């Protein structure tokens, strides 16, 4: 074999060896930081505020959360179901069950966090005794929240329902309406904005707080603290056991969060843990 060919082959062998050694010495790519970030859908008040409160502590414990704020109840669950967002924190079990049934989704409750007592509000009246004949009452238009609103009126003697314990009662289930109330079914987020256009409105506390209403002071009627309508952290079957989700659930139910809720919301948001 010619010396030139021997030298050339030796050079190629050395080059290949260098490449192999370089590859062996290379560190594997670090996992994306996105794996340490949990996205959470929430309504602005109180849910996003509670999440902002625990965010620094979670970050110190190695978990970043990205809070996505919504002003309706449909998109948060839709985004979670379609895996654009990891979990949601804004809804009650009756709402979740109705959503799953109507939309064919399989979202699951992970942890109960707090109760927001629903209230009856008016810009015109000072008490239930002042409700005039034929008054117009605006109520939420989603099935579970409408049922909850009607139960509030029923339990306070304003109307009578066919089944006084049915959380999914609708207007057709009213069997007694001595005041001849007229009901307007509206999207929940719009109720504070129509308060001056109707006699009364039954408003979810998160929307009431966002509109600067104080449920414990401004509501003519309010659910008591034994309300079963707990707001839950909600996820999917494929992430309910994710360590990040469990860490978030634990962070939402600490003594510090309880104290924060009690001090900031003065009874309008009641810890459920």
PLM segments and residue spans:
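Ligand-binding "clamshell"
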Residues: 98-110, 125, 197, 202, ...
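A bilobed periplasmic-binding-protein/Venus flytrap-type ligand-binding module shared by bacterial periplasmic
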Residues: 117-128, 230-242
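Short, polar/charged alpha-helical segment
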Residues: 44-68, 75, 79
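Short, well-ordered beta-strand elements
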Residues: 33-45, 63-69, 136-137
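Beta->alpha turn/N-cap motifs
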Residues: 45, 72-73, 83, 87-97, ...
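Bacterial signal peptide processing site
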Residues: 24-27
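Short helix-initiation/N-cap motifs at beta->coil->alpha
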Residues: 68-78, 165-193
């Amino acid at each position: 074999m010619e010396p030139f060919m021997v030298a050339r082959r030796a050079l190629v062998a050395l080059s290949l060896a260098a490449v192999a050694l370089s590859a062996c010495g290379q560190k594997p790519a670090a996992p994306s930081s996105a794996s340490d970030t949990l996205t959470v859908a929430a309504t602005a008040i109180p849910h996003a505020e509670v999440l902002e409160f625990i965010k620094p502590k979670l970050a110190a414990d190695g978990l970043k959360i990205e809070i996505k704020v919504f002003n309706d109840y449909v998109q948060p669950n839709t985004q979670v179901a379609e895996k654009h967002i990891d979990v949601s924190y804004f809804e009650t079990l009756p709402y979740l069950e109705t959503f799953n049934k109507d939309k064919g989704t399989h979202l699951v409750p992970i942890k109960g966090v707090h109760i927001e007592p629903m209230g009856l509000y008016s810009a015109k009246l000072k008490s239930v005794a002042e409700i005039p004949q034929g008054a117009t009452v605006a109520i939420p238009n989603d099935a579970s929240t409408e049922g909850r609103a009607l139960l509030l009126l029923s339990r306070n003697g304003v109307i009578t329902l066919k089944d006084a314990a049915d959380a999914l009662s609708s207007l057709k289930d009213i069997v007694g309406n001595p005041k001849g109330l007229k009901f307007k079914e509206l999207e929940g987020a719009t109720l504070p904005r129509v308060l001056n256009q109707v006699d009364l409105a039954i408003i979810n506390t998160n929307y009431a707080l966002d509109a600067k209403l104080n449920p414990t002071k401004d509501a003519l009627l309010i659910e008591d603290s034994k309300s079963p309508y707990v707001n839950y952290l909600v996820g999917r079957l494929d992430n309910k056991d994710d360590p990040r989700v469990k860490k978030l659930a634990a962070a939402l139910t600490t003594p510090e969060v309880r104290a924060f809720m009690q001090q900031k919301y003065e009874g309008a948001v009641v810890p459920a843990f």
